[in-house]
Regions:
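Non-catalytic cap/lid and distal C-terminal segments of serine-dependent acyl enzymes
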Residues: 1-188
Length: 188
């Protein structure tokens, strides 16, 4: 059946998060959407890929699928290195994959970096993006998050920082312990 969000495009441009973050543009290609989301916390646009559910005729949950160390700007992505896109295309879930923030550990940095700029990724994932996704895509409000490599550590921190926000959090090949000497070396 036709996806009412894609057909009407009525919700895609409307939502604004409490801090002023918003969807500034969208491209639609069948079941795939490419959104540009303005992050007020980082003062820049973030590309967000969305794969709509197999059956989008009713609200569906969201899986935030987070790329590894390169933030999806490299070739080490979920889509390029796994068949997760094909697998999830047959499921009734919105798959949301932000791109950007290479080697930023997807945390909120205390200071801006001369090379990487302002990094407020935890704010983006916990405060800015979810209300936009829920409103724009008409979701159920149920969400999970999964990440690999460097970002796997971050998604575990998100689940700790905001208990109950995600119905599930999965970390693959991450460095979950960052307070011992080995973990501190990874954080440098």
């Amino acid at each position: 059946s036709a996806d009412p969000i894609v057909v009407s495009q009525s919700l895609l441009a409307d939502p604004v998060s409490p801090n002023g973050s918003k969807i500034v543009s969208q491209e639609i290609n069948g079941q795939q959407l490419t959104l540009k989301v303005y992050s007020a916390a980082m003062d820049k646009d973030i590309t967000v890929y969305v794969q709509r559910p197999r059956d989008a005729s009713e609200p569906r949950p969201v899986l935030y699928l987070v790329n590894g160390a390169g933030g999806g700007v490299d070739k080490a992505t979920w889509w390029a290195n796994t068949n997760v896109g094909d697998f999830l295309a047959t499921k009734d879930v919105n798959v949301v994959m932000p791109v950007g923030g290479p080697f930023a550990y997807y945390t909120d940095w205390k200071n801006d970096d001369p090379a990487l700029g302002r990094n407020k990724w935890q704010t983006f994932f916990l405060e800015e993006l979810p209300p936009l996704v829920d409103a724009a895509l008409g979701t159920t409000g149920v969400q999970a998050i999964a990440a690999n490599s460097m970002t796997a550590t971050a998604v575990l921190q998100y689940a700790i920082a905001k208990p109950g926000f995600y119905s599930a959090a999965a970390a693959y090949s991450g460095c979950a312990q960052t307070s011992d000497p080995i973990g501190k070396e990874f954080m440098k």
